[in-house]
A protein has these predicted regions:
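Bacterial N-terminal signal peptides that target proteins for export
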Residues: 1-10
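C-terminal motif of bacterial Sec signal peptides marking the signal peptidase cleavage site
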Residues: 20-21
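ATP/NTP phosphate-donor binding region
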Residues: 34-35, 39-124, 306
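ATP/nucleoside-binding phosphotransfer catalytic cores, i.e., glycine-rich phosphate-binding loops
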Residues: 43-44, 49, 277, 302-375
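Accessory alpha-helical/coil subdomains and C-terminal extensions
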Residues: 52, 58, 65-68, 81, ...
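Short Gly/Thr/Asp-enriched flexible loops that form oxyanion-binding sites at enzyme active sites
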Residues: 137-159, 300-309
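Short, acidic/small-residue loops that bind anionic groups at enzyme active sites
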Residues: 148-178, 185-189, 313-322
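Internal gly/pro-rich beta-alpha loop/helix module
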Residues: 164-235
Length: 375
């Protein structure tokens, strides 16, 4: 009898152990070593996020924020907001801590001097923070090079500033915006991009704001630096192979911190049978500076030159550029004698940007010519 009771007790104990073991959760059975490994992975993930660069995206509108389900040429620019742009490229979170601000949301033909000042001041303020490693500005491509060059001359920081756009609206088939935006964030977060001035990133290419220009109305590879070349390319990694020798960003003499407006500078275009009256009209309209897009080496017809000289005598600064799209405009002959300045290698639209800023400091033609030779 005692033996039977003893056997029953052993059987009951065994069954109890079996059921208790089966009811344990996987977590309860996890060894201390496994727990340590799990915590280590979680900690590494948080550490990775903290190690990523912090990039601020400032959106201004343009095609990259445009909408059209099928057309790549007929669409409404400046419709999609910055948060939607960021959400459309979730992969950016793997390479940077990204957040956005909507500065304006317009087609880039509507970017005016007021917007340039607002954007430039905001970029400067953000980059003055130790918590921000780089800036990306989304922008319409039509005037992108002008904004990029403005930032190149006015932001006093060696942290990366990247201006990006797209040639196809964000909702179109084969939109180039998401890839361009991802690459822009990648470049803005790269240590190697520091000190290179404002950069323009599209189509897997990195260009300097000083030299790049839009060359085609619809092609995705429209932005080129014909004479100087790109300064880098983007593949799995970022490859820089060129340096900028012109003054820019932190070495620039120009400051917009106390400015609430910029001088009026107009662009006139040279052609056969042009006249002097356009110079008179610009002066009458309040121009403080005029950029003349001349033929060849910034050439003016006799009639146009008379108008330019009259403008100079009335205190208006006149700079000769070229309509050819490339090459250096040189100082020579009667042009120098008449204080008709040369834009060096700046195209008319960028010459206008530099002349506006130059006129905030001086109206001395010799000093302004020095600016064009240095910047």
């Amino acid at each position: 009898m005692k033996t039977q009771r003893f056997l029953l007790l052993i059987l009951f104990t065994a069954l109890l152990l079996v059921f208790t073991g089966c009811s344990q959760s996987p977590e309860a059975k996890e060894s201390p070593k496994e727990k340590a490994q799990t915590q280590k992975v979680s900690s590494a993930s948080a550490s990775k996020k903290n190690d990523l660069p912090t990039i601020k995206i400032l959106a201004t509108g343009g095609t990259i924020a445009g909408k059209s389900k099928t057309s790549t040429t007929e669409y409404k620019a400046g419709v999609v907001g910055v948060e939607s742009l960021i959400e459309a490229v979730p992969e950016m979170k793997d390479i940077a801590n990204v957040s956005g601000e909507q500065v304006v949301n317009v087609g880039s033909t509507n970017i005016d001097n007021k917007t340039l000042l607002k954007l430039g001041k905001r970029v400067s303020k953000l980059l003055s923070s130790k918590d921000v490693n780089g800036i990306v500005v989304t922008h319409g491509t039509d005037t992108l090079e002008e904004t990029a060059y403005f930032l190149n001359l006015t932001v006093k920081s060696d942290k990366p500033i990247v201006v990006v756009g797209s040639m196809r609206p964000s909702t179109a088939i084969s939109a180039d915006g998401p890839s361009n935006l991802y690459n822009a964030v990648k470049v803005a977060g790269a240590h190697e991009a520091k000190g290179k001035g404002t950069l323009v990133v599209l189509n897997d290419r990195i260009a300097s704001a000083r030299y790049v220009t839009k060359t085609n109305t619809t092609a995705t590879d429209t932005f080129k630096s014909e004479e100087m070349g790109y300064i880098g390319t983007i593949a799995d990694d970022i490859y820089f192979h060129n340096e900028i020798t012109r003054k820019h960003t932190k070495d620039s003499e120009f400051s917009i911190s106390s400015l609430d407006k910029l001088p009026q500078v107009d662009i006139l275009y040279g052609y056969q049978n042009d006249g002097s009256y356009l110079f008179d009209a610009a002066v009458k309209a309040g121009a403080k500076g005029i950029v003349f897009a001349g033929s060849g080496n910034g050439s003016l017809s006799d009639a146009a030159e008379k108008g330019a000289v009259r403008a100079v005598k009335k205190g208006v600064t006149v700079v000769r550029s070229t309509r050819t799209g490339d090459g250096v405009v040189t100082s020579n002959g009667d042009y120098v004698k008449n204080d008709l300045l040369a834009s060096n290698s700046l195209n008319p639209q960028k010459a206008r940007i530099l002349l506006m800023l130059a006129l905030t400091k001086t109206d001395d033609p010799r000093k302004i010519q020095d600016y064009f030779n240095e910047y």
